[in-house]
Amino acid sequence: MSLALKPAVVLERSTPMSGAVELVVHHPPAAAALRPGQFFQLAVAAPQTILRRPYSAAWADPDSGRIGFIFNVVGAGSGWLAVRHEGHELDLLGPLGRGFDLDGSKPAIIVAGGLGVAVFPGVVGALVARGRQVTVLLGARTSAQLLPSGRFPGAEVMTATDDGTAGYQGSVVDLMPVALGRFPPPQGEGRGGGPEIFACGPTPMLQALLEKSRRLGVPLGLIQVSLETPMGCGVGTCLGCAIARPGDGYLLTCLDGPCVRADRIDWSRTADAFHG
């Protein structure tokens, strides 16, 4: 369900990890409507910006009407957002798109590379609230860029850093065999057996995750990914976020995603469309 919203009011601004900003805004209708993994189109007033910018919500609290956004400063739009503070208003459109499918009872493995972690605090909270066993795999270049494990209460957290300053030294994808080894293996193709995997991160990480999962016998149907594609309108009009699906045809990230099961995507034809 998408909403044309009156402005949200910024309540807090913080830096949860190096290079990232977290804005907490107040908008009760949006907080109540949001499903984990959905996104908003935020209007920015930076110079030379015309289109709204898509940002996945990190979490929402319907009781207090609060929504959190975690993002890196990479351009004019995010730079403008990064200097908003308490009392500023933000023009939001959303929530938009499809969030993660959190139904079921399988154990869940979260694979978050870099700022891909931004979508997962609310996802993990919802999974834990459903009684599902959750293991969070966090990866970053260095320890200062890791979201604190305390943001995932009720889940086991494992970390990997490129420089070895926290946890395993190497890619977060390298933690997959350890995490998967704690559960019965998947039962062939489809979605039977084994844990379910939820992932978001840079393109190389997603590609490595899919290859590692294939070698470990994990069907693509057990993997859900949150896609980061170039997006214009966010409502299915501009077709700028199309990604190829198996066979003929395309999915639109803004309508069919951003959260999609990996077996619905033709990765050989769409790898260049993603950026993280």
Identify the meaning behind each predicted range.
Residues 2-86:
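Ferredoxin-reductase
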Residues 119, 203-204, 227-259:
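Local cysteine-cluster metal-coordination motifs and their immediate loop/turn environment
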Residues 12, 59, 159-161, 225, ...:
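Structural signal for conserved beta-strand scaffold positions within catalytic alpha/beta enzyme cores
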Residues 76-184, 191-230:
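FNR/FR-type flavoprotein reductase catalytic core
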Residues 1-5, 183, 188-192, 272-276:
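Short, low-complexity, intrinsically disordered N-terminal peptides in bacterial proteins
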Residues 45-49, 94-99, 247:
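Short, charged beta-turn/beta-strand-edge "cap" motif at the junction between a beta-strand
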Residues 255-276:
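Short Fe-S-cluster ligation motifs
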